[in-house]
């Protein structure tokens, strides 16, 4: 017992000495402030906006954005409106005029490119020929001086802003023929056109890949897409704060815009 009491007394002496040392150190040196925990952010993106937001995400992380986990989830437009309206997500991205009842901020105006398969030798196309192709009246590339190959028209969902802007700016409001294949997104369009030597389509310029290339209007010397663009918006249930605000400010910065508009130079 005596040994046990002596051991406990010795232990209490050591603890007291340790506390005294800690208090003394605390009096002479300020205790460092705790490092704030990195935030997480899950963002929604429509099919039109998805690849653009993925680019922004990657660029933000490469620039050293302070965030623990940054995710982009693909969602339908109606799902986005419902989730933002209910306050379930801090941030979402759409390519369309946003609902006036939600907080919104413009991110970028992205030029639309008319594109063909990289194997297509044509560099230019007359606007009337373009409209004939999309109306379904011109069906073989041989009619335009290219090697014989069936024209395969690929369009986007008619409710997409990219499709509307293309019809307004490039087709003069004309409709697209019923034989067109519908791609569900810009990256799907890029893949479809890249897979078919006879394909022609359109997409936002940051969806360009080495397997496709833009066509020009004959005589104008500028990509046809200079006449049409699609606008990317961020929407939120309320003005963003924290890492959501940090991400938006970076997206609107010159660095963010450069990341966003990769492949978009004339």
Give residue spans per PLM region.
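Bacterial N-terminal signal peptides that target proteins for export
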Residues: 2-15
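Bacterial N-terminal signal peptides
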Residues: 13-25
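Exported/periplasmic ABC-transporter solute-binding proteins
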Residues: 27-86, 92-266
